[in-house]
A protein has these predicted regions:
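Signature of alpha-helical transmembrane segments and their immediate interfacial
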Residues: 1-41, 410-411, 415, 419-466, ...
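Alpha-helical transmembrane helix bundles of large polytopic membrane transport and channel proteins
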Residues: 29, 83-205, 209-213, 526-604
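Solvent-exposed, non-transmembrane loop/terminal regulatory segments of multi-pass membrane proteins
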Residues: 34-76, 193-202, 433, 437-439, ...
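Extracytoplasmic
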Residues: 166-293, 513, 584-678
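Hydrophobic transmembrane alpha-helices and their membrane-interface caps
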Residues: 296-343, 691-739, 804-805
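Pore- and gate-forming transmembrane helices of large, multi-pass membrane proteins
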Residues: 301, 353-382, 696, 748-780, ...
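Transmembrane alpha-helices and their membrane-interface boundaries in multi-pass membrane transporters
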Residues: 317-318, 333-349, 362, 366-370, ...
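Juxtamembrane segments of multi-pass membrane proteins
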Residues: 440-564
Length: 828
């Protein structure tokens, strides 16, 4: 490759102005377009969707993004009265709405239930009575028609009328003298009845023991969008702080998807700033002490920055949008880019001649770039935007960095930088490198034993597809969730499922009815512990309602209605109640009923309705049902429940599990493709199968060794760290290529200096990466923490194999004449 880069160097050396113009112009162009790039912060949108169900689970469904507001007593020994908790919740919700007048982050808050709702709902229910009456309930109704049952109920009716001060009780008795409400809708309309783990008192929502007041906030954005969520979370947290300061006896707890998303993002940012920031400071100090000139530091940083800007511009030209997580993951790939710069700088540090440096280094650097790019480009064969973005950005970063290092960087190298120290080199590093890593039988024997153990154990490494395990468990959010589960979840885990149709509400209602029948069978089989019947009782398709209306007409014959009227008048007379009091009820029995739509009637408050039904902007209709199950049977339950037609679980990570496993399988295939590509490039470059295999050795073996020791230490692959393992592949190729170039120079010409120069550069490259990755071990976020541990294991195996096993195998093969002849190595 020096035949390409040397003429370029000489041309720009004689035309410095043109070189500076090209450098500045390209930097400005790349920087301008790189700044236009948009970032996707929602990790879920970066995963592949293989079906409509998956796509729907990832859509902006308001219920899964709902925020839970809880107000309880700060002093649990002296609890606040429920009435005070309810008032406090109203005040807090009013404060939130006032704070949101300009930002419009809140779509709505459901904090109380209108006391008139029961009468409105009863009026609608009686106007469409047959539609809500399951045929299985006619047996109970028939029992209510006996004279004894009527007399017993009439006594209760009389007591209600006697104690009625507003007239509402009398109206209720007139509309429903048989108390059919207890048969039909008692579990829904009675304010004292628990509904989905909640109770109502004076219109306020409470947990069953009334020690916690509840409210539900619906964000005006996707809960997994941590960008928009950050402003919303800050706004709510400020309101909580102000409200608690004004009400010292009150404790406010908040939990929901937006808070979890923002908490994870903030934790990642803090971890990266602290760990990488401190590690880079340490690296800066070491580099200045080693090179004795600050210019060497910026000469390492600028090419990497140029490559990053070049990559951002390319991403904008190709896609226009990029995964923010892929950008964060790509930061560690910059370690490979620094490695190329180190080889240029350290080689120049020793030889003091830019042309000789290019003659010696252009081929291994370019070859290392090509093979590493091949490893990253293999990610383009996956179905995940996250992996593709990572592969593209890493590829363009390395290309931009390599071009800068070989075209522009040599013009900024001057002999005065190394005049004071050139002949002394790096004594401590050289002493370390001079240790007999490849000649000591104990070192080789121990390494071979460790390699065998790693390879044997490698099949036992596991892959964790559950993205929920990558969440950071914030203390405040954990407290809020724990309180909610303790007070409302009856000891079981709860999750919402949705029956849906693309556009037809009636079809969605039919799917929902079928779904509830499926849930009923699962409950009888003991697979689930229970489910909320609300959506099944309230929402019925026109066809289903018409069938129920026909059954109603068949039950209420003229003879039965006449007998009921006679019995009601007689029973009412015993309490001196008017004989015409129940005329409106008798009229209901004779009414010519038509199917109705309780949603379009608007009698259910929007905040309450959102717990059971949602119509999306694209016309899709969804009906929600809360299902209770034993936590340890989660996977079994989720799969069993979603076997129903047109039903999804409102947990995107459920679908992520299967898709992340697909990504894992894609990744394994990608590694094989990348390996074959790298081996072919090495074979084409060295033109000798034995040399290509030796150069390929560290990358190939280190992958299995890393997996083996992950299994030994109980570490598992996940979506994040498996991507980073590509980096281990890439750096392993680079190190082996540079060592191989040095070994060949030593074997052919007897020049040991080339190998020494390369090993010094490898040492500094490995040191930089080791410091950065070791710092990640101290991160609080589990995803970042796992990256640090796995990268350390991979780096250690790569360095040991490159330093010892690769030279050992090469020197053993050099003892054979066929090997020396095949690669023009002279006889000893």
């Amino acid at each position: 490759m020096h035949r390409i880069f040397l003429p370029i160097y000489r041309f720009f050396r004689n035309n410095k102005g043109l070189m500076y113009l090209l450098l500045i112009a390209s930097t400005l162009v790349f920087g301008y377009y790189g700044m236009q790039l948009k970032y996707e912060e929602n990790i879920v949108k970066l995963l592949p969707r293989s079906s409509t169900d998956n796509e729907l689970a990832f859509s902006d469904i308001g219920l899964k993004d709902k925020v839970f507001l809880q107000i309880t007593s700060r002093d649990t020994l002296n609890p606040v009265e429920p009435a005070r908790l309810g008032e406090a919740m109203e005040e807090f919700c009013a404060l939130l709405e006032k704070q949101d007048e300009e930002t419009h982050h809140i779509a709505g808050i459901f904090s109380s239930l209108d006391v008139d709702m029961a009468l409105d709902a009863m009026d609608f229910a009686l106007s469409h009575l047959p539609s809500f009456l399951d045929t299985s309930l006619y047996t109970g109704i028939e029992q209510s028609l006996t004279r004894a049952a009527i007399d017993e109920q009439m006594e209760e009716n009389f007591q209600i009328i006697q104690n009625d001060e507003t007239g509402d009780g009398t109206q209720l008795v007139a509309m429903d003298p048989l108390n059919l409400r207890s048969v039909l809708l008692g579990s829904i309309l009675d304010e004292s009845t628990s509904m989905g783990g909640m109770t109502f008192e004076d219109g306020h929502i409470f947990c069953p023991d009334k020690t916690v007041s509840l409210a539900f906030l619906t964000p005006a954005f996707d809960g997994l969008d941590s960008g928009k969520g950050a402003h919303f979370v800050q706004q709510v947290q400020e309101s909580v702080k102000a409200f608690e300061a004004a009400n010292p006896d009150i404790h406010v707890l908040v939990y929901g998807m937006p808070f979890d998303s923002v908490s994870n993002t903030a934790t990642i940012e803090r971890d990266l700033v602290l760990t990488i920031g401190l590690s880079l400071l340490l690296i800066l100090i070491i580099m200045i002490m080693s090179f004795h000139r600050f210019s060497f530091v910026w000469q390492q940083v600028v090419p990497v920055a140029y490559g990053a800007v070049f990559a951002l511009a390319c991403m904008y030209w190709i896609k226009g949008v990029m995964s923010l997580m892929a950008l964060g993951l790509s930061a560690i790939v910059l370690g490979v880019a620094i490695s190329y710069c180190l080889h240029v700088l350290i080689h120049y540090y020793y030889v003091g001649d830019a042309e000789k440096m290019l003659r010696d280094e252009s081929t291994p650097i370019f070859l290392g770039c090509i093979t590493t790019v091949g490893a990253f480009m293999g990610l383009m064969f996956t179905d995940s935007d996250l992996l593709r973005d990572f592969g593209l950005f890493a590829t363009f970063s390395l290309i931009g960095n390599t071009l800068f290092a070989l075209i522009f960087l040599p013009h900024f190298l001057h002999k005065k930088q190394i005049a004071f120290k050139r002949t002394h080199g790096f004594p401590l590093v050289e002493k370390f490198n001079d240790l007999p890593w490849d000649r000591n039988k104990w070192v080789i024997g121990t390494l071979l034993l460790l390699i065998v153990v790693g390879i044997v154990m490698s099949p036992r490494v596991k892959f964790d597809p559950d993205l929920a395990h990558l969440d950071y468990d914030d203390e405040a959010l954990h407290e809020a969730l724990e309180l909610y589960n303790k007070k409302n979840a009856d000891g079981f885990a709860h999750i919402n499922f949705a029956a849906w149709d693309e556009s037809d509400m009636n079809e969605a209602m039919s799917y929902n009815q079928d779904f509830h029948a499926h849930l009923d069978s699962l409950q009888r089989a003991g697979i689930i512990k229970g489910f909320s019947p609300v959506s099944g009782l309230l929402f019925h398709s026109e066809e289903d309602q018409q069938e129920r209306i026909d059954a109603w007409k068949a039950f209420w014959t003229r003879e039965r209605v006449a007998q009921l009227r006679k019995d009601l008048v007689a029973s009412a007379g015993a309490y001196q109640l008017p004989s015409n009091l129940f005329d409106s009820f008798i009229s209901l029995l004779r009414e010519d009923y038509k199917p109705g739509n309780i949603i379009e009637a608007g009698i259910i408050p929007t905040g309450l309705l959102a717990n059971f039904y949602e119509a999306q902007e694209n016309g899709r209709q969804l009906f929600f049902t809360d299902v209770a199950y034993a936590p340890e049977e989660q996977n079994k339950v989720w799969h069993a429940v979603t076997e129903a037609d047109h039903v999804i679980v409102l947990e995107p990570f459920f679908y992520c599990r299967d898709m992340v496993e697909i990504i894992h399988d894609d990744f394994s295939t990608t590694l094989w493709i990348s390996s074959i590509f790298v081996l072919l490039v090495l074979l084409f470059s060295f033109r000798n199968i034995w040399i290509a295999l030796i150069a390929f050795l560290p990358m190939f073996i280190s992958w299995y060794v890393m997996q083996g020791y992950m299994a030994i230490f109980g570490l598992e692959f996940n979506l994040i760290n498996i991507v980073i393992s590509t980096f281990i592949y890439g750096i392993g190729v680079d190190y082996s290529i540079f060592v191989m170039e040095g070994l060949l120079a030593e074997a052919r010409k007897g020049e040991k200096s080339m190998l020494n120069y390369h090993k010094v550069a490898i040492f500094y490259s490995a040191m930089v990466l080791a410091i950065v990755t070791f710092s990640l071990v101290f991160a609080r976020h589990p995803a970042i923490h796992s990256i640090g541990l796995i990268t350390l294991i991979g780096m250690a195996s790569t360095i040991l194999i490159t330093y010892s096993l690769q030279p050992f195998v090469f020197r053993q093969l050099c003892k054979f004449r066929f090997f020396r002849r095949g690669f023009r190595i002279p006889e000893n």
